[in-house]
């Protein structure tokens, strides 16, 4: 039976500090080219594995390489399905979190199945503060709109831009305080 969190009051799952080591030991030799990368949060454990990149001739195009990598990922998914399910059930029982699998091959990656939950329930306080900053600054009308905006804007300069926006808002607040009394 798959793990299902109890309804009602939220309880913290057990610590998963050793999850990466446990999962590395549970994954059969030969499945992956390196130890799996394990990402843990309160709700889910994602196991990322890297599979060998297919060898193609020198004349192959980027499209050929992409197709070969997608094919390798698909084959891994099919060949290891029963074993991955068995490991996932053990991990879910041990750590009381849902388990998802993802595979990387060359430049291609695919997350097979993953926990789907309402976005706002999964955000931590720092993420909500980013959304609130965008709403307060008038960039978005709601947290949902701010989240959609963030997804479109994600890039290397996002943090710099948010810092500048917060500084500008601080300056606006200072100017409001200096203004005439109402």
Task: Place the predicted regions along the sequence by residue.
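Short, basic amphipathic alpha-helical segments that act as recognition/interaction helices
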Residues: 143-162
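Short secondary-structure junctions
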Residues: 26-34, 91-98
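N-terminal presequence-like segments and adjacent domain-start helices
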Residues: 1-14
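Short edge beta-strands and adjacent turn/loop segments
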Residues: 29-56
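Surface-exposed, Lys/Arg-rich phosphate-binding patches that contact polyanionic backbones
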Residues: 126-144
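Short, positively charged interaction helices/loops
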Residues: 157-182
